[in-house]
Amino acid sequence: FIECNGKLYFRANDGETGRELFVSDGTAEGTQLLVDLLPGKDNYGDNYSSFPDNMVEFNEKLYFSANNGETGRELFVSDGTAEGTQLLADLRLEDDNYGYSHDSYPDNLVECNGKLYFTADDGVHGNELFVSDGTTEGTQLLADLRPGDDNYGYSYDSYPDNLVEYNGKLYFTADDGVHGNDELFVSDGTTEGTQLLVDLCLGDNIYGDSNGSFIRNLVEFNGKLYFTADDGVHGNELFVTDGTTEGTQLVADIR
């Protein structure tokens, strides 16, 4: 469920349209299907579903991911009307080997400092950090934190996750291929200003790969950002940051 412009939006299946986007004003009469993005039935007679997901309000509109059957799972926008609910950007244009549209899988949608950030895979850079100003032209890759391809020719992924706004900047976890899994990154909204904040778990594991601190559960409290992490010394414990490398430290070794 998400509130946007005084109405409640959610995904539901009414038995006639599949799992689609619904809207409610809080009354029985005002609770209804907003739009069926993927109409029709499959070969078994079941309704197709667009599966709206990852909903967030941004600039008084609703943004979400869905699959309309033509573009794959991509980024959509709605102004609260059926006519105004449409594809915002098809980030992964090519089809797979079976002729079906590839999905970019937009995820982790969050507003920060007047922009919409999310993760997606455009088929070129792997799963990376994207940004949008709410327009098709202004929806683009922000930073490829792990460039290059693997031995099979597939793009490396940095897998940005745990996106959160703090003090006007975006904080998130990622693996840049150098510092390990789920270290803490920060972005000021520019490519140059998107970078590692701190590598909490230094060194390599027995396979020669960088240790990861596996940061999770980022939440702002009393003007600081708290999270869980494993620095390789204390185990998985509570950490805090004031947004600087020097101000990122262990709060308590509880066990």
PLM regions: where:
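Feature 14080 marks short, conserved micro-sites in well-ordered regions
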Residues: 1-255
